[in-house]
């Protein structure tokens, strides 16, 4: 019950952030709904396809898609009127996104565990569910996914997955396991945002032909 409530809050918030991303790319209402849906439920769909878990979550519960689509349409008409206050809403969205990330990861991990998969697959399922909606959104908006650019996001999904898996393995009561995972991972995500923690970045620039010609010849 707790996960279901948090999941609904999460997909609504993700749908709204997806709609805003589509608006920045000047998409029509159809594009807005598609980007919002991909952001909110795309990660779970990718997970289900890879694991052979059918029917897909939003096919089994079409009301989830309707919630996301409704949130997207509402965002289209409300966003222009609250543009001056968007910096305050951005903070709210960051908090809700952090919560959604953890909730998605827990759900992905639980589905993989219910299917009897190993820890490796459980971790992959949790990370895909938590982070790949944003990856698909950025790809469709022709941007390098934010998940791949230093920020601790997929790493938090992995941390949440491992935490939940460990607690479940120790046979901690389900609701308590969810709450402990949510509190720990949610707090870590907010700290990462505040202190701008990130993973090391690989910055490789290949020399042009002119730059290579300027390099001193190395004697053998």
From Swiss-Prot:
Residues passing through the membrane, by range: 26-46, 65-85, 92-112, 116-136, 152-172, 175-195
Lipid bilayer topology: Multi-pass membrane protein
Main location: membrane
GO cellular component: a single term: plasma membrane
InterPro entries assigned: Gly_transporter
Compartment list: Cell membrane
UniProt keyword terms in alphabetical order: Cell membrane, Membrane, Transmembrane, Transmembrane helix
Highest taxon of source: Bacteria
The family this protein is said to belong to: Belongs to the UPF0126 family.
PANTHER family: INNER MEMBRANE PROTEIN, UPF0126 INNER MEMBRANE PROTEIN YADS-RELATED
Full protein name: UPF0126 membrane protein HI_1240
Species for this entry: Haemophilus influenzae (strain ATCC 51907 / DSM 11121 / KW20 / Rd)
């Amino acid at each position: 019950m707790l996960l279901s409530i948090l999941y609904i809050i999460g997909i609504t918030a993700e749908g709204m952030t997806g709609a805003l991303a589509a608006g920045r790319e000047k998409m029509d209402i159809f594009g807005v709904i598609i980007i919002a849906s991909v952001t909110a439920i795309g990660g779970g769909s990718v997970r289900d396809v890879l694991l052979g878990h059918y029917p897909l979550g939003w096919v089994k519960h079409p009301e989830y898609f309707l919630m996301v689509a409704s949130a997207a349409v509402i965002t289209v008409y409300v966003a222009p009127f609250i543009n001056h206050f968007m910096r305050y809403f951005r903070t709210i969205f960051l908090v809700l996104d952090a919560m959604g990330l953890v909730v998605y990861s827990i759900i992905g991990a639980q589905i993989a565990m219910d299917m009897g998969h190993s820890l490796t697959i459980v971790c992959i399922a949790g990370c895909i569910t938590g982070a790949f909606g944003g990856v698909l959104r950025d790809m469709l908006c022709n941007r390098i996914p934010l998940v791949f650019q230093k920020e601790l996001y997929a790493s938090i999904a992995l941390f949440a997955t491992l935490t939940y898996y460990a607690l479940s393995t120790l046979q901690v009561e389900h609701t308590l396991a969810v709450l402990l995972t949510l509190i720990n991972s949610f707090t870590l995500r907010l700290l990462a945002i505040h202190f701008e923690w990130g993973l090391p970045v690989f910055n490789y620039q290949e020399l042009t032909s002119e730059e290579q010609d300027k390099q001193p010849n190395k004697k053998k």
